[in-house]
Design a protein with these regions (language model features):
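N-terminal, charged low-complexity regulatory/assembly segments
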Residues: 1-155
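Hydrophobic packing positions characteristic
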Residues: 102-222
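Short helix-to-turn junction characteristic of helix-turn-helix DNA-binding domains
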Residues: 226-232
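Short acidic, hydrophobic short linear motifs in intrinsically disordered regions
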Residues: 232-242
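Long, positively charged, glycine-interspersed low-complexity recognition regions
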Residues: 246-247
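Short amphipathic alpha-helical interaction segments
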Residues: 250-262
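A short, conserved structural fragment
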Residues: 264-275
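Short, cationic-aromatic polyanion-contact patches
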Residues: 275-281
């Protein structure tokens, strides 16, 4: 199976802290436990989330408050627009803006102090049990958003030491495995109706630090998951799956040998210390 280049989100890995309203201080010399400060923080937070509903906080020039609220909402919205271009193209900018407004109003965006983690919070918002119920939105939207977000997650994942198994093989350290009820890798503007189809996709960085996408069969996805669980111990993974599938471990190892070669060629699987990946003998 051939890895393919996924959609280019153009998302920047900005690690600047997002200014959560609750963290605002009235002055450097004031104690954070003061009741007045706590009340003020709550007023600011409510207004920033719903400026058209909550009353404007007192103690600061209204124009400055409104400018800050607008900047905060626009910054959060810009990160979501950048990370989910395909979702936006398919549901329309107005629908995406409506989702961002609710996401912002509910305050789910400041679960992390880093702007680059806002898209993951937005995916969690779409996947939540109380996610927006709108018949005009496609049922696959949350899964497509997760698929688009995986590119950002892999692109910005830190470099970590390879976890080399006993056979001298290692999985790409930035590897993410996604499982979906819809064929998220084929959804496009030309699709009048998307038919459900169980889909597994491995998303990873190759040796040139390019994000690649590899669509997997259910069996291949189970093998990859077993390799992740067993520290890329190919024999242990085969033994685990063989007992589950009612096969001998050696028999299964022979059946998946071509897959090992393909993953090495795709650089999803690595042989550390070699200039080019080579299949195990």
């Amino acid at each position: 199976m051939t890895a393919r280049q996924g959609p280019n989100n153009g998302q920047q890995a900005d690690t600047a802290p997002a200014p959560a309203p609750e963290a605002l201080q009235a002055g450097a010399g004031q104690a954070s436990s003061a009741p007045g400060l706590t009340r003020m923080q709550g007023d600011w937070s409510s207004y920033f989330r719903q400026p058209g509903v909550a009353p404007r906080p007192t103690g600061m020039e209204p124009r400055r408050i409104d400018v800050y609220a607008s900047l905060l909402r626009n910054n959060i919205g810009s990160f979501i627009h950048q990370c989910f271009p395909l979702c936006e193209a398919l549901i329309g900018t107005s629908n995406l803006e409506a989702l961002i407004d609710r996401f912002f109003a509910e305050g789910r965006w400041h679960t992390s102090p880093f702007f680059h983690e806002i898209p993951k919070a937005f995916v969690d918002f779409l996947q939540a049990e109380d996610a927006p119920a709108d018949e005009s939105l496609p049922p696959w939207l949350a899964e497509l958003a997760h698929y688009e977000w995986l590119e950002l997650a892999v692109e910005t994942a830190p470099d970590v030491p390879l976890r080399v198994g006993p056979q001298g093989l290692a999985l790409c350290p930035a590897l993410q495995l996604g499982g979906y009820a819809y064929p998220v890798h084929t959804i496009g503007a030309e699709d009048a109706e998307v038919v459900p189809a169980t889909t597994f996709v491995a998303v990873y960085r190759d040796r040139q630090h390019q994000v690649r996408f590899n669509v997997l069969t259910p069996a291949a996805a189970q093998l990859l998951d077993a390799l992740q669980d067993n520290g890329c111990d190919w024999q242990a993974a085969c033994e685990q799956l063989a007992s589950h599938w009612g096969l001998a471990a050696d028999e299964l190892a022979g059946q998946v040998a071509p897959l090992q070669q393909q993953w090495l060629a795709d650089e999803l699987l690595l042989r550390p210390g070699t200039a080019q990946p080579a299949a195990a003998g």
